[in-house]
Amino acid sequence: MKLVTFNIRCDFGQDGENCFCRRRDLITAKIRREQPDIICFQEVLPHVAVWLKENLKGYYVIGCGRDVNLEDEQVSVAYRRDRVNLISMDTFWLSDEPYVPGSRYACQSICPRVCTGAVFSYSGGPGKAYLFRLYNIHLDHMGGEARRLGLELILKRADRESAFQNIPVILAGDFNAEPDSPELAVLKSRREFTNVTEGIGCT
């Protein structure tokens, strides 16, 4: 199975030559070349989510906006229709009230942070189906404490999941943190997790 994480960058008008309208064809061309089974996107605005659904042929796209009206940025997950089946999906906010839309930690920026969680079945061939749990996140860009709390919330939820226990867990996204940061020490302390990006450098 091939999984990629992709901060698509918000469609800001001030980006000039690097605006989304100039990057769209490059994005679809890159995805066609790589042919990933799962794509974890970050910074997906509502109109970009529509564009992804219309232009990622052969993929389904799931996710929901982070603000109180379920709009604004989302952390979308795209998965191949021919190899991956969605078993269950959950959207929650990184906050003390995970199911209150738009909620956030007091120690973070003004931006709510949302997580797209899902259980998938991946077809590795005839008679070979593998279940796994995926969390796609975009941690706060300002508050290290908020990043730590967000990671701890996700790990606790993964530990408590009653359905489909003992299946592999994948945590992907934009962590907004350096490898040696205190917040990522939360993950390093969990020996059951492997950092598959180690050694590839910054992107």
Task: Label each PLM-derived region with a short phrase.
Residues 142-203:
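Metal-dependent phosphoesterases centered on the DNase I-like endonuclease/exonuclease/phosphatase
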